[in-house]
Design a protein with these regions (language model features):
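AAA+/P-loop NTPase substrate/partner-engagement loops
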Residues: 56-81, 142-144
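Conserved D-loop-proximal element of ABC-family nucleotide-binding domains
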Residues: 83, 114-116, 146
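Charged, glycine-rich active-site and insertion segments that engage polyanionic ligands
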Residues: 1-49, 53-62, 130-132, 139-248
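Conserved Walker B
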Residues: 109-113, 140-141
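Conserved alpha-helical scaffold flanking the Walker A/P-loop in AAA+ ATPase domains
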Residues: 16-21, 83-104, 112, 123
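Flexible beta-alpha connector loops of hexameric P-loop NTPases
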Residues: 76-83, 110, 154
Length: 248
């Protein structure tokens, strides 16, 4: 499928390693880094490479969550991945793939596993079937029990430079000024930068935030009003962040 990770902003070292692994992937990976840096996006693309080769229709189904051999596991409104979800995952892992030679499980909030869930998964991670691959996503290795983390190949995602984020946004069709502003506010997180640059409600926060230095004065009342305005504008930003995290 050409350059598998060409739409990923930053993370060149990470995507180079995973590209090399596509023909013979490890049984389990732990993708760690801050929310919004692109871990889940890269995980899905890695799944595309493993399952689909040069089949674009297969790739689209993976990215849309429609491929029967890619299973997404997430808290689903709960505070943690539960033992019931873990047991269901173990049961599915023991089944043969539906279409190809491999079945991929993406744990989108691996750090949200409780101890019971981790223990339920442990035997499958210790003795995986040849057809099963786990992609566990978390903010830090410390978010998972050591017994789980030690059985995964760890891939670390760092924050991306403002320059690389701005360049990536421009490549996606975002105007230069908007791209640079979004990159500056994003804190090195391309996923957040994309929301800041492309969603109208989130862009309103960007505009308010960028205007603050020009509107500050010595009057305390102005500061309070600005703080209220920034807080109000941040509501859609927080909603977008939550949505991004859930879709990542």
């Amino acid at each position: 499928m050409g350059n598998l990770f060409e739409q990923v902003i930053g993370h060149k070292a990470v995507t180079a390693v995973l590209s090399r692994d596509v023909p013979e992937p490890a049984q389990a990976y732990l993708l760690v880094g801050p929310h919004g840096v692109g871990k889940a996006t890269v995980a899905r693309l890695f799944a595309v490479g493993i399952l689909c080769g040069e089949d674009p229709q297969c790739g689209r189904r993976v990215l849309r969550g429609l491929h029967p051999d890619v299973v997404l596991i997430e808290p689903d409104g709960r505070s943690a991945i539960t033992v019931e979800q873990a047991r269901n995952t173990v049961a599915l892992a023991n089944l043969a793939p539906v279409e190809g030679e491999r079945k991929i499980f993406i744990l989108e909030e691996g750090g949200a596993m409780n101890d019971e869930a981790a223990n339920a998964l442990l035997k499958t991670l210790e003795e995986p079937t040849a057809s099963t691959i786990f992609l566990v996503i978390a903010e830090s290795e410390d978010d998972l029990p050591e017994t789980v983390a030690s059985r995964c190949r760890t891939v670390v995602f760092g924050r991306v430079s403002e320059t690389d984020i701005a360049a990536g946004l421009i490549q996606l069709g975002v105007g230069e000024e908007r791209a640079e502003q979004a990159a500056r506010i994003s804190g090195g997180r391309p996923g957040l930068a994309i929301s800041l640059a492309t969603r109208a409600d989130v862009a309103a926060f960007r505009n308010v935030w960028m205007s603050v230095p020009l509107r500050l004065s010595e009057h305390a009342g102005d500061g309070y009003r600005l703080a209220d305005e920034v807080a109000a504008a941040a509501d859609p930003l927080m909603a977008a962040l939550k949505e991004r995290q859930e879709s990542e």
